[in-house]
């Protein structure tokens, strides 16, 4: 099979002409369908060609934030990652993106199934993309929110940007839900730090979405969200609620996040 059309796609990708990439991908998929190459074949040259097409499909889809298309291409390329083919230079990136996609969807069981299905387990240790996502998932599951935020802030993989924002939003919502149950009010500026938001405007937007009341620079949580059941069945009432200082230090904010993580773990146990 000629690589002429594939070279053209590679050139379009390098030029970041995403619309042209999509059109070229469509042409190539028609060719793949004609030759029954949507499933792995014993012809290594053809299988490698199909794998390349699907890999480009994954990367173009994430660049254009077309997640439905991304999921489709990811499911099509993964069966082509087997030992009989020469390893793909894009395998780590595509695998990492697929794992991050599953994490962003909170499909944790599928995340671990996908890990188990990776034919080259050494990828976990030598590939920076896969290793990074595995570490991120571990921190999310452990409630290590500071580590999650730090990893996302310092990540140098631009292809991960879309899904990282979703994961950070998941963490933020988890913190917000726990915060509602732990105390009845919190200074707006402290909430901004606690929720890893850039400024109070973002916090005000989140407050509106969650039905929080803001008065005089203080967020008041809904009463019905304040009761929290402990492991012994007792409820924390208003007298037991935590009181934040007017200006919490970074250490205080970090300690609160640890408490919220512990609170979340208690709820999972109960």
From Swiss-Prot:
InterPro entries: 26S_Psome_Rpn12, CSN8_PSD8_EIF3K, PCI_dom
Superkingdom classification of source: Eukaryota
GO biological process terms, semicolon-separated: proteasome-mediated ubiquitin-dependent protein catabolic process
Cystine pairings recorded for this chain: none
Keywords attached to this entry: Proteasome
Gene Ontology CC terms: chromatin; cytosol; nuclear periphery; nucleus; proteasome regulatory particle, lid subcomplex
PCI domain: residues covered: 65-237
Functional summary from the UniProt entry: Acts as a regulatory subunit of the 26S proteasome which is involved in the ATP-dependent degradation of ubiquitinated proteins.
Similarity comment text for this entry: Belongs to the proteasome subunit S14 family.
PANTHER family named in the record: 26S PROTEASOME NON-ATPASE REGULATORY SUBUNIT 8
Protein name: 26S proteasome regulatory subunit rpn12
Species annotation: Schizosaccharomyces pombe (strain 972 / ATCC 24843)
Phylogenetic placement of the source organism: Eukaryota, Fungi, Dikarya, Ascomycota, Taphrinomycotina
């Amino acid at each position: 099979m000629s690589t002429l059309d594939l070279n053209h796609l590679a050139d379009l990708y390098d030029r970041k002409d995403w619309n042209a990439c999509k059109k070229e991908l469509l042409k190539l998929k028609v060719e793949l369908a004609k030759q029954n190459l949507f499933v792995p074949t014993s012809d290594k040259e053809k299988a490698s060609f199909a794998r390349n097409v699907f890999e480009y499909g994954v990367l173009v889809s994430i660049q254009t934030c077309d997640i439905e298309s991304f999921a489709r291409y990811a499911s099509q390329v993964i069966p082509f990652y087997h030992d009989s083919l020469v390893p793909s230079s894009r395998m780590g990136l595509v695998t990492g993106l697929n794992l991050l996609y599953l994490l962003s969807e909170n499909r944790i069981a599928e995340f671990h199934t996908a890990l188990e299905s990776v034919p080259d387990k050494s990828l976990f240790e030598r590939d920076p993309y896969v290793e990074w996502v595995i570490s991120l998932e571990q921190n999310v599951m452990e409630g290590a929110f500071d580590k999650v935020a730090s990893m996302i802030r310092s990540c140098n993989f631009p292809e991960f940007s879309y899904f990282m924002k979703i994961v950070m939003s998941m963490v933020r919502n988890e913190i917000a839900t726990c915060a509602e149950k732990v105390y009845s009010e919190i200074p707006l500026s402290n909430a901004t730090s606690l929720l890893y938001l850039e400024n109070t405007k973002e916090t005000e937007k989140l407050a509106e979405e969650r039905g929080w009341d803001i008065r005089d620079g203080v967020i008041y949580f809904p009463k019905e969200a304040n009761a929290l059941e402990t492991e012994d069945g007792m409820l924390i009432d208003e007298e037991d609620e935590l009181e934040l200082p007017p200006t919490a230090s970074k250490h205080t904010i970090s300690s609160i996040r640890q408490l919220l993580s512990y609170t979340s773990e208690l709820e999972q146990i109960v």
